[in-house]
Amino acid sequence: MKLSRRSFMKANAVAAAAAAAGLSVPGVARAVVGQQEAIKWDKAPCRFCGTGCGVLVGTQQGRVVACQGDPDAPVNRGLNCIKGYFLPKIMYGKDRLTQPLLRMKNGKYDKEGEFTPITWDQAFDVMEEKFKTALKEKGPESIGMFGSGQWTIWEGYAASKLFKAGFRSNNIDPNARHCMASAVVGFMRTFGMDEPMGCYDDIEQADAFVLWGANMAEMHPILWSRITNSRLSNQNVTVAVLSTYQHRSFELADNGIIFTPQSDLVILNYIANYIIQNNAINQDFFSKHVNLRKGATDIGYGLRPTHPLEKAAKNPGSDASEPMSFEDYKAFVAEYTLEKTAEMTGVPKDQLEQLAQLYADPNKKVISYWTMGFNQHTRGVWANNLVYNLHLLTGKISQPGCGPFSLTGQPSACGTAREVGTFAHRLPADMVVTNEKHRDICEKKWNIPSGTIPAKIGLHAVAQDRALKDGKLNVYWTMCTNNMQAGPNINEERMPGWRDPRNFIIVSDPYPTVSALAADLILPTAMWVEKEGAYGNAERRTQFWRQQVQAPGEAKSDLWQLVQFSRRFKTEEVWPEELLAKKPELRGKTLYEVLYATPEVSKFPVSELAEDQLNDESRELGFYRQKGLFEEYACFGRGHGHDLAPFDDYHKARVLRWPVVNGKETQWRYSEGNDPYVKAGEGYKFYGKPDGKAVIFALPFEPAAEAPDEEYDLWLSTGRVLEHWHTGSMTRRVPELHRAFPEAVLFIHPLDAKARDLRRGDKVKVVSRRGEVISIVETRGRNRPPQGLVYMPFFDAAQLVNKLTLDATDPLSKETDFKKCAVKLEKV
């Protein structure tokens, strides 16, 4: 084939444009590209939210050049959201980090020095000295790690092993503490096992969708497209949306409900009362499969013990409960009448009744969806428990088309943070550090001395901030997260500890984020398909991908960093003599040898990889590291209701939902005929509980930790927007996404703006008791707050909204309430 230079250039342009848009490449263009190097396509899960969309990644000449929705992926069926289409560009920001950077002055580390390029050996030298000094002088409780629901499964597993087994410190927590911890505790309290019982297949079979504090139109747009299709193609399908402000999901709602912040607890109890008063209980299900318990109340707000609210609490942090009778439960919810609920919530009575009728109608299959509106809540665990009550009263659970479903916001908040157990209190497969039997199981599988894993729960995310500020936590490693921007109360509780000269802060990240720039040492990190990985999404799907390109410069994966750093420590440097005496054969070995190069982990040869398959980590070692770690980890859940398939199956299949038993995935847990752990004749079995029964909790309304008053007269709610993901550290480096939403704005009701002499586009100072930021007034647009509330996204590093937020948490889950604090506005 002969082409002129002009035709050649034109064909190249056509090929590039088609690839970027996920379109088929025209024949002439395909032929021209083929003369250079054909685009190679391989599957991967999307890098962003917890939906778990499948994408096809196109690589050419060592770079990711295109991305399209995977038509064979059952989650998204070939469709991407706007962020998914621009995945290639998140990897190639102009300020991508390519070498370690240490604060230095006069050739040495200095807390006040300038960031200076160093080698990896030099970086590990400094880290080794800081870790060993802290461990020797103050012990394991003086070191900590803050990880991520964006870690791959084996990265989270490796991190947990290093800290809990190697360093003997449970001071490791993921950023999922800020988003999913309330869901975890809610699941564990009600069902005894974590994660949803249903799946996305419910969407096409449901009669009604109820969104509790979830703007799925922007935060889970692919799932929302499926709900939209269901609603618009079936006039009998109903959508109800509850929120403290109006957002894009309201555009589809048949019943759009705006309620006073914190009063969702009242609505939930009202619906339970309605179900009982209208004889809508599924008596057969209820009598066989449910227990009733009354929970402790007045449990505080997770603030420092010296805070007046904590001093005033009668049962601070109490998770206690006691059995109660049905008559007592009936009397408890009877207080939440229609009249009282309307008064406390500000919701019209007819809307409340319409909502309650959805749950009470035995012929309607209902799905309840929620995300941060429930979870980022000082009574987030209670909110989770109370929505489960509605499904347990009516038996609308664990069957196609109906059930409660907690959506996740990160790609592996489920698969890594929760299932692997990277929380400060957890171990793999729902085990916990406080349980001696669970610790014993881990120690035996890891072949480490009995008593190695501490029984004491480590510091959770907010407690880590406080310990850094107080000088109790002195070496702190943050990976795959931007908590300096994303965490609460930056001014009072985070920045002081990070910049305290007693402390040494390490941040591993691909970009110079707010967190990285506040650190002492920055480690350049490989991202997404620059490494082999695995994520677990919101519906228990585990998804694998292969390394498809190499990371730029000296950037290394989080797994590489963890494993290489472990070589710097011998067992006698981190374990006391009494432990070594139990396993003297481990004396003199490095943590690398004990944790990551065991016969169990290293038994899979690198020859299992295709000759042309990239896998920098495994080829460096000579064994298939990811496979070894995964198979060791997977053995914790097999036979215990958390069964994962063999490693190789995930590379062959698009996705598999656990438990995977005899090669078959599970769509609906806990019900006969769907779940292999429920025997014939049992009907339902909530086997996370010893008696196989789920729990309905009686839990009351309790007020927020901070509410508007005469001086700080507005509620502030924070969150996200469609175009940006979390702190924007990836999406703001995509020019198209940045242009679409270049800076954060303050969404405000027009009358609230007018009362303060503010107009759309004006600069405004937003002030709380903890800090202030300058933003831009927005009285129109996608988010429409009611009078008395303002909404501000947190993606903008130039407008750190978390200078304003309060570090109050749910006392049970330790998850921060980012949705409710009090602010005032000042015109600039």
From Swiss-Prot:
Subunit structure of this chain's protein: Component of the periplasmic nitrate reductase NapAB complex composed of NapA and NapB.
Enzymatic class: oxidoreductase
Superkingdom of the source species: Bacteria
Co-factor: note: Binds 1 [4Fe-4S] cluster. Binds 1 molybdenum-bis(molybdopterin guanine dinucleotide) (Mo-bis-MGD) cofactor per subunit.
E.C. code: 1.9.6.1
UniProt KW keywords: 4Fe-4S, Electron transport, Iron, Iron-sulfur, Metal-binding, Molybdenum, Nitrate assimilation, Oxidoreductase, Periplasm, Signal, Transport
Ranges for domain 4Fe-4S Mo/W bis-MGD-type: 39-95
UniProt xrefs under Gene3D superfamilies: 2.40.40.20, 3.30.200.210, 3.40.50.740, Dimethylsulfoxide Reductase, domain 2
Family: Belongs to the prokaryotic molybdopterin-containing oxidoreductase family. NasA/NapA/NarB subfamily.
The reaction(s) this protein catalyses: 2 Fe(II)-[cytochrome] + nitrate + 2 H(+) = 2 Fe(III)-[cytochrome] + nitrite + H2O
Lineage: Bacteria, Pseudomonadati, Pseudomonadota, Gammaproteobacteria, Enterobacterales
HAMAP family hit by this protein: Nitrate_reduct_NapA (MF_01630)
PTM summary: Predicted to be exported by the Tat system. The position of the signal peptide cleavage has not been experimentally proven.
Organism: Shigella flexneri serotype 5b (strain 8401)
Reported function: Catalytic subunit of the periplasmic nitrate reductase complex NapAB. Receives electrons from NapB and catalyzes the reduction of nitrate to nitrite.
Name of the featured protein: Periplasmic nitrate reductase
Residues annotated to bind Mo-bis(molybdopterin guanine dinucleotide): 83, 150, 175, 179, 212-219, 243-247, 262-264, 372, 376, 482, 508-509, 531, 558, 718-727, 802, 819
PROSITE patterns per UniProt: 4FE4S_MOW_BIS_MGD, MOLYBDOPTERIN_PROK_1, TAT
Binding site for [4Fe-4S] cluster: C46, C49, C53, C81
Compartments in which it is found: Periplasm
Signal sequence, renumbered to the chain: 1-31
Entry keyword annotation includes Transmembrane: no
